[in-house]
Design a protein with these regions (language model features):
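Active-site beta-loop-alpha junctions enriched in small/polar residues
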Residues: 66-68, 91-93, 125-127, 151-153, ...
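Alpha/beta catalytic cores of nucleotide-metabolism and tRNA/nucleoside-modifying enzymes
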Residues: 2, 11, 26-31, 36-62, ...
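Polybasic, lysine-rich low-complexity intrinsically disordered segments
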Residues: 4-5, 23
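Conserved beta-strand positions in the central sheet of alpha/beta enzyme cores
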Residues: 87, 121-123, 147-149, 217, ...
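Short glycine-enriched, charge-decorated loop/helix-capping segments at active-site entrances
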Residues: 161-167, 227, 292-296
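Alpha/beta enzyme core
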Residues: 137-146, 150-160, 171-249
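Glycine-rich, positively charged N-terminal anion/phosphate-binding segment
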Residues: 45-57, 66-139
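Intrinsic-disorder-associated, low-complexity terminal segments enriched in Asp/Asn/His/Tyr and depleted
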Residues: 8, 13-14, 18
Length: 466
């Protein structure tokens, strides 16, 4: 075999001490196929940009990377309900590179399987280019791209110096992405948050792309928008980036996806290639169902989703899907458990890692309870999904029976409203008002939005999209 040679594209940039970060000498996106290896008998190149996107089917509906939540079983379920691309949970690059036990816990034989789990993007957090490359090499052949997490806003990311806490260190971000771009056999992508200043965000996005990122996902929240200050993602800044980046940029939008028709609206208003959902997907896997399909498929029965998901988990090898199961069950059943608090207590007692019989008991309880509901003579009048008037933000709120999966609207201004919501769910006959529908503030203009407290089920290790 002839001697292998590597050919790298050198991208020049000037590091500035200004807060806006590096100033690119070539601000337009530089997209050139890098030859990975070349010998007298063969050559190999990796797809980039639009060609890569088209090779995986031009996906439009994407499961976001979520810590301990976008694991294999959940990805399989989400694909059945319309997801066309999935990201893994965020993996810690140094641990993935150096700890066999960590890899075994996080990555199993079915992960990235061509028949079960593709297309797939594997996400890592990192602050060391060498560890990132070592980690990424473990998943070559089992994914379509590797993503760098530049969005995690949580305290653990601050302490570990990764995620959104690299946003001011453009030199390091460039080196992390470019290391994979020039030395890894699969493409690299990136997911970012925004700065308050849209021009600074645009320069940031250009730098990420020039480093070699083939897809750019923009989460329209700043690093500070978390916990009590979560608020809404700003679609206007996402659209500004889309309009001002090269048109051939493969561009995904993330944030504010509550219903299937929000995906259609986002694609149209922003002009993005695809829409990513995190929390919306966790509470209702049907969020990825086409908005033109039957409403009852867009908002599936909780007992049906629970049984389907549980059967998938039982089949999946490894521990990752089992560890995540309890959290998923709480989210899928959230509106149901507000009414049937006895079953909530049973869910809380489950040991999902070692005791499948605990889960089976809960699944059967939920199935029996929902069957009782559907045995009522007036079920056709009760099992109705209705939409309110069109709002200024372009969509409308939906009134969904509590036995169907639906988005979770966090209480606002410190008022939980749990009792009011529960009574509304029980009656299914009350009109939509600000008293029983606290989500009415969710789509206010950016400067009018109230602060929103954390999800009650969020643990110290955040389960949100990062």
């Amino acid at each position: 075999m002839g001697k292998k040679k590597s050919f790298n594209i050198i991208i020049l940039y000037h590091l500035s001490t200004h807060q806006s970060g590096p100033k690119l000498l070539f601000p337009s996106r530089l997209l050139t196929l890098r030859t990975l290896s070349r010998s007298s008998s063969s050559s190999m190149t990796k797809l980039q940009g639009r060609e890569l996107y088209e090779s995986i089917g031009s996906p439009k509906r994407i499961v976001a990377p979520m810590v301990d939540q976008s694991e294999l079983a959940w990805r399989i379920l989400s694909r059945r309900y319309g997801a066309t691309l999935c990201y893994t949970p965020m993996f810690h690059a140094r641990l993935f590179a150096t700890s066999e036990k960590y890899r075994q816990d996080m990555w199993g034989e079915w992960d990235g399987d061509a028949g079960k789990d593709r297309p797939l993007v594997v996400q890592f957090c990192a602050n060391d280019p060498e560890y990132l490359l070592q980690a990424a090499k473990h998943v070559v052949g089992k994914c379509d791209a590797v993503d760098l997490n530049l969005g995690c806003p949580q305290g653990i990311a601050r302490k570990g110096n990764y995620g959104s806490f690299l946003m001011e260190n453009w030199d390091l971000i460039y080196r992390l992405i470019n290391k994979l771009h020039t030395e890894l056999d699969v493409p690299v992508t990136a997911k970012i948050r925004v700065f308050e200043d849209r021009e600074k965000t645009l320069e940031y996005a250009k730098m990420v792309l020039s480093a070699g990122a083939q897809f750019l996902t923009v989460h329209g929240r700043t690093r500070e928008m978390k916990g009590q200050k979560t608020g809404l993602a700003d679609w206007s800044i996402i659209k500004y980036l889309r309009d001002n980046l090269p048109q051939d940029t493969v561009f995904f939008a993330n944030g504010n996806i509550l219903y299937p028709d929000d995906i259609s609206r986002c694609l149209t208003e922003i002009g993005c290639d695809a829409v990513m959902s995190a929390e919306g997907n966790l509470y209702n896997p049907g969020v990825f169902v086409d908005a033109e399909e039957d409403l009852k498929r867009q908002f599936p029965r909780v007992d049906h989703i629970l049984r389907e998901y549980y059967e998938i988990v039982k089949d999946c090898p490894g521990n990752a899907s089992k560890i995540a199961m309890k959290s998923h069950i709480f989210k899928v059943l959230r509106p149901f458990l507000e009414v049937h608090t006895d079953i909530r207590q049973e869910v809380a007692k489950m040991n999902t890692k070692y005791r499948f019989d605990d889960v089976e008991r809960v699944v059967k309880l939920v199935e029996a309870t929902v069957e009782e509901i559907f045995a009522k003579p007036d079920i056709e009048q009760l099992d109705v999904i209705t939409a309110g008037d069109k709002q200024l933000w372009g969509g409308s709120y939906k009134k969904v029976p509590y036995w169907r999966c639906q988005p979770y609207f966090r209480p606002v201004n410190g008022v939980s409203g749990d009792k009011r919501v529960t009574e509304a769910l029980k009656s299914q006959n009350e009109p939509l008002t600000s008293q029983n529908e606290p989500q009415l503030s969710n789509h206010l203009p950016h400067n009018k939005r109230p602060l929103q407290p954390d999800n009650e089920e969020q643990t110290k290790r955040s389960k949100q999209s990062i």
